[in-house]
Amino acid sequence: MANTTGEPEEVSGALSPPSAVAYVKLVLLGLIMCVSLAGNAILSLLVLKDRALHKAPYYFLLDLCLADGIRSAVCFPFVLASVRHGSSWTFSALSCKIVAFMAVLFCFHAAFMLFCISVTRYMAIAHHRFYAKRMTLWTCAAVICMAWTLSVAMAFPPVFDVGTYKFIREEDQCIFEHRYFKANDTLGFMLMLAVLMAATHAVYGKLLLFEYRHRKMKPVQMVPAISQNWTFHGPGATGQAAANWIAGFGRGPMPPTLLGIRQNGHAASRRLLGMDEVKGEKQLGRMFYAITLLFLLLWSPYIVACYWRVFVKACAVPHRYLATAVWMSFAQAAVNPIVCFLLNKDLKKCLRTHAPCWGTGGAPAPREPYCVM
């Protein structure tokens, strides 16, 4: 057996039955794996299958779902095996580095991706015309590739022992070995993760401030129409005089309201943001912020434990706190589908369409034509 903690241990051929704590860990992690794999698979299939979801926000959501699903399928089985073998690593040192690399890769990928999503949410509300014109499929692909490239750049150096990947017995996983900061190589990685999370929430704070400033509407000021020959033109005109003139009831010259009836081609081509689109963008913003907030809440205890190891040398992290923090970070891989189906009406509608038996009363029956008498 290869144990990368530096303390070789031997595992007997017959496995001892797991303790109550290990049994709880196995059950919880197994449940997290099932929910993550099923939820992310369903959400990914919906985004791929339904044309109504072929939009930039859902492409980013698809990338997050695929990353969480791969993390659950690749990394979590090794954690289950280590718990089953009494918090021991029974595989090679190379496999430990590979699993640790993938775990850190998916963590940083989620952080980078959530930051990019927060920027696109701000652009969708504050600069919608630019967003609608520039946020194409290829732009989304470029953003996703950039997030993966930055994640690889953050997770790859420890493979060459720049910040060491080792099996941490207290965490039952292969991950960064966080030591005291005077002999530590991982402080920079933790600072980068903290800066990313802070920057993401700063962008959402700016978006909230923008919406608050633009939610106040000016009161309607009634401007009287101007008329010298009963044509009634000007800012307060309703166009009724022009309609009367067209119908043959007008007298005198053509009303000024008809002189500018031909619109400017550039102004006509400018796309305005309707109320339905505003509500849709705000709904997507709330959903992605809920995902970001849960990412922060579920990873914060583990990040606090990492900083504790780096800056506090005299006192070790309590074992129960560390175990809870690690399993909370595992649970983050399963929460995204739940949040999306709870907060997104479009995803609920698509789910009912493709799985009518899950909806209330099945698929809606086609309406018969009728006439109002």
Curated annotation (Swiss-Prot):
GO molecular function terms attached to this record: gonadotropin-releasing hormone receptor activity
Main location: membrane
Listed transmembrane segments: 27-47, 60-80, 98-118, 140-160, 189-209, 288-308, 323-343
Cytoplasmic membrane side: 48-59, 119-139, 210-287, 344-373
Residues carrying sugar: N3, N184
Pfam families: 7tm_1 (PF00001)
Residues exposed to the Extracellular side: 1-26, 81-97, 161-188, 309-322
Cell compartment(s), UniProt: Cell membrane
Gene Ontology cellular component list: plasma membrane
Disulphide-bonded residues: C96-C174
Membrane topology, as annotated: Multi-pass membrane protein
GO biological process: negative regulation of neuron migration
UniProt KW keywords: Cell membrane, Disulfide bond, G-protein coupled receptor, Glycoprotein, Membrane, Receptor, Transducer, Transmembrane, Transmembrane helix
Function: Is a receptor for the SMIM20 derived peptides Phoenixin-14 and Phoenixin-20. It mediates the Phoenixin-14 and Phoenixin-20 augmentation of gonadotropin-releasing hormone (GNRH) signaling in the hypothalamus and pituitary gland. In the ovary, it mediates the effects of Phoenixin-14 and Phoenixin-20 induced granulosa cell proliferation during follicular growth.
Similarity annotation: Belongs to the G-protein coupled receptor 1 family.
Protein's name in the database: Probable G-protein coupled receptor 173
Organism this protein belongs to: Bos taurus
Gene name linked to the record: GPR173
